[in-house]
């Protein structure tokens, strides 16, 4: 965890209106790029009224897979695997500004400091400069299971880590093969003390745990949607590509069992068994898991142009998810709410905003439509294939716990 980010971001906010010249220093000395402060602020404001996609980054991992290497252009093919793509984890992402073929990167924070009300709309005073929703990929294709883990309860993350809200997440199965699964919720006969003893003994003795004695294993298929509110035991199995949609407080995950494997550095990855035990809801077990933690989508609207489905999230989630299926085009209104979108089936779309700006977005690319965009059109660029798009947004009248 990088404490300097928090300190320097406060300074960055104060500096934004005073900047005369901003330099992108990620290049050789004779290739540095710069932008005037006025152009920077104008570009950010324009972005806040139309659309944006952050620059994602990709990272290998102990359980990483091969799907992203084979499906996303421009990635390093020499790495053994890719485990994560932080598609929209704004503490890690930058924004690219282009002029005359040159691309300059600035911190995402600048956009929120410049125009957070345009970005977030009706929930802007709830979240202020903290962008609330995160999209990322977990790739276990030809890889391995994720660690068995959970996320902190709201009060716990506030008291122990000084974060404004916690990570309530979901798994959307973008792709899968063979016999994919998701580990989610406890078996009906779970005994917390036995679970803790077994995990701690495994950590001390490096012995395997028969995890299905304690944790349910659910078969998964493409476009399934699993709900993982804070305090829920969970993990993705191998041979999945998971679009993880979650709230975005940063990196507070309590790993409790990691299959007795080594990290990329050849050492066991750190576990946080006691933190996990302090936060788990052991009542999320048995049939309750199927009823409350596996989403049951339903059709909200269906006509010749489009099918709109609601993918209800858990009551703990402050965001909701809709899914749109269409072949030609659809018109959207933001209703003063920020939309975070991804094409989960199809080739590409063209987004055209009320202000007349246009941009192509491809399959599996995350893009954001700010609340201030008001209305926009999504046009399928290959009508021979249908488009399936998921949209996440903050629920009405949200208050943070």
Language model regions located:
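Transition-metal
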Residues: 2-6, 11, 15-193, 258-297, ...
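Ligand-binding loop in jelly-roll beta-barrel domains
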Residues: 140-145, 176-179, 232-251, 371-398
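Glycine- and acidic-residue-biased ligand/ion/polar-headgroup-sensing regions
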Residues: 142-144, 168-169, 173-202, 239, ...
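Tight coil/turn sites that cap or link beta-strands
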Residues: 153, 229-231, 239, 326-329, ...
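Loop-centered beta-sheet repeat module
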Residues: 206-259
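Short acidic-glycine-tyrosine-enriched beta hairpin
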Residues: 215-226, 353-372
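Non-heme Fe(II)/2-oxoglutarate
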Residues: 238-242, 246-271, 298-301, 336-337, ...
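Acidic/His-leaning functional-site neighborhoods
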Residues: 295-365
């Amino acid at each position: 965890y990088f404490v300097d980010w928090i300190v320097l971001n406060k300074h960055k906010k104060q500096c934004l209106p005073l900047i005369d010249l901003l330099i992108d220093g990620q290049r050789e000395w004779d290739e540095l790029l710069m932008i005037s402060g006025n152009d920077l602020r104008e570009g950010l404001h324009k972005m806040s009224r139309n659309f944006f996609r952050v620059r994602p980054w990709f990272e290998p991992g102990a359980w990483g897979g091969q799907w992203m290497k084979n499906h996303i252009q421009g990635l390093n093919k020499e790495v053994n695997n890719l485990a994560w793509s932080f598609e929209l984890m704004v503490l890690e992402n930058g924004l690219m500004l282009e002029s005359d073929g040159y691309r300059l990167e600035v911190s995402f924070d600048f956009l929120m400091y410049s125009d957070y009300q345009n970005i977030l709309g009706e929930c802007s005073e709830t979240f202020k400069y903290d962008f609330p929703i995160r999209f990322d990929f977990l790739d276990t294709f030809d890889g391995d299971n994720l660690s068995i883990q959970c996320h902190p309860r709201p009060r716990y993350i506030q008291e122990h880590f000084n974060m404004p809200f916690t990570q309530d997440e979901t798994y959307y199965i973008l792709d899968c093969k063979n016999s994919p699964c998701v580990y989610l919720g406890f078996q009906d006969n779970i005994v917390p003390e036995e679970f803790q003893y077994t995990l701690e003994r495994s950590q001390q003795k490096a012995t395997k745990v028969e995890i299905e004695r304690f944790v349910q294993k659910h078969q998964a298929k493409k476009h399934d949607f699993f709900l993982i509110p804070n305090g829920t035991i969970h993990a993705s199995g191998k041979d999945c590509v998971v679009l993880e949609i979650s709230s975005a407080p940063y990196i507070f995950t309590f790993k409790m069992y990691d299959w007795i494997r080594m990290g990329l550095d050849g050492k066991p990855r750190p576990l946080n068994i006691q933190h996990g035990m302090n936060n788990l809801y052991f009542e999320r077990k048995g049939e309750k898991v199927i009823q409350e933690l596996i989403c049951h989508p339903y059709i909200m609207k269906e006509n010749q142009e489009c099918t709109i489905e609601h993918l209800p999230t858990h009551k703990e989630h402050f965001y909701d998810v809709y899914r749109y299926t269409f072949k030609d085009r659809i018109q959207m209104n933001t209703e003063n709410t920020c939309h975070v979108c991804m094409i989960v089936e199809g080739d590409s779309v063209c987004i055209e905003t009320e202000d007349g700006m246009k941009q192509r977005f491809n399959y599996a690319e995350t893009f954001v439509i700010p609340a201030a965009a008001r209305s926009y059109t999504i046009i399928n660029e290959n009508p021979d294939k249908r488009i399936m798009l998921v949209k996440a947004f903050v629920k009405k009248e949200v208050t943070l716990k």
